[in-house]
Amino acid sequence: MARPKKRSKTKKILFAVEIIVLLVFIGGLYVYGQLMSRMDKTNTQKLDTQKVQVNEEVQDAINSEDSHLTGYTTYALFGIDSRSANMKFSGNQNSDTMIIASVNNDTKEVKLVSIYRDTLLNLGNDTYSKANAAYAYGGPEQAITMLNTNLDLNITDYATVKFDALATIIDDLGGLDMDMSYAEIVHMNNYCVETAEDTGLSYTPIELPEKPEDQEKVQYSYHLNGVQATSYCRIRYTASLDMGRTERQRKVIQMIVYKAKHAGLSKIFNIMDDVFPMVTTSLGKEDILQLLPTLIGYSIDETAGFPSSYKFSNVKGSIIVPTDLVSNVQELHKFLYGDANYTPSATVTANSEKILEIVGGASNLDDVQTNIGEENTANDTVIFENDGSGWTDTSGSGEQYDTDNSGDTSGGEDNTYVPDDNTGGNDYIDDSTGGDD
């Protein structure tokens, strides 16, 4: 009589396993359905691949599978100002946050590099300006072309986020614990007024501690909500300038990723509901779904800023000049891809030489930025072009820009130069409408 009992026990175990598998399957279908329904909230904007350029040497190496880039996937992340009423993801505003994300496909290691917004680079068609102006010239295609051709990259996908998305996701995650300096507290409180107005979210000003002798020393700890943490990311008038601003942004991104990885499913769904409408990406539903399961295994281990070696040229305020672009690109590829012997392309070499020509040579550069504060006209656009007689700043001409090198400057809003009368200078629609920016 023992055998039938044994078989009965075995059947019960198998039945229990089948129930568990069925529940997991149903749960998987539920999660899949929830994810798919939320994917519709993102703004999918495929890149016009005809407008995205890659340097010839880089493309040849990729085609021959003889490139260190083949083991990695590289994305461009852009942050744009959400304060303008006519703000569009496609262009007409500067991308004041530009981050390169390199993903090692084998180790799942992620590295982030911020491009300093005032870095003088070739935006395309031998027109040189601050890096953050590329997005205003021709949307994500032009911004990615700038990154690819100046830095020898092969970026084919991107995501653009409105700044108020940052405040929203931080609030959804319950805020962030941040160590700050006295100077950062002062500037953060100032930015909070405008950030709260722009996002419609609330905050409580942090009461200033007694002013210390060293105002730049990080020695105070606070729990920041979305408005406060976003304002913290906007600070660029401490001694560390834009380098400190981008470092703060990368720090906040790392903290968000860590908290999101440890959040429950309901909280993740809530974040998707709130934030996805504020995101535009070239990635389709299936692309995003393929990324989501592996995100748990990813870790942001290292971050940096670009250029790593730079000086300042005080043109209409201040611009950051790579010294020189070739060596900076070598360091970039060493950091992102582990290639210590990378030889930059002829395009990078030519751009490097032209950048130094524009600023009058390395001897005209300063080790420090001379103007710090609201009086600094770093928001003013500089557009350097060479008509054969030398480099001149044509930013005051109000002319249109040939984004695709076709000879046509009348092809729609991506080509249109927009003067901003708010600053007394000629700007693209930017963060120059008030506040500390």
What are these regions (language model features)?
Residues 54-65, 72, 86, 269, ...:
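C-terminal solvent-exposed extensions
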Residues 137-206, 282-284:
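Amphipathic, coiled-coil-like alpha-helical scaffolding segments used for oligomerization/assembly
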Residues 70-73, 93-98, 107-115, 126, ...:
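Extracytoplasmic
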Residues 2-108:
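Entry/capping segment at the start of metal-dependent catalytic domains
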Residues 78, 84, 118, 145-154, ...:
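Structured segments of extracytoplasmic/periplasmic soluble domains
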Residues 84-90, 128-137, 152-157, 219, ...:
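Second-shell loop/turn segments in exported
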Residues 66, 70-71, 171-267, 411, ...:
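Flexible, polar/acidic helix-loop-strand segments at domain edges
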Residues 97, 128, 140-148, 163-167, ...:
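Extracytoplasmic/secreted envelope proteins and their assembly/folding machinery
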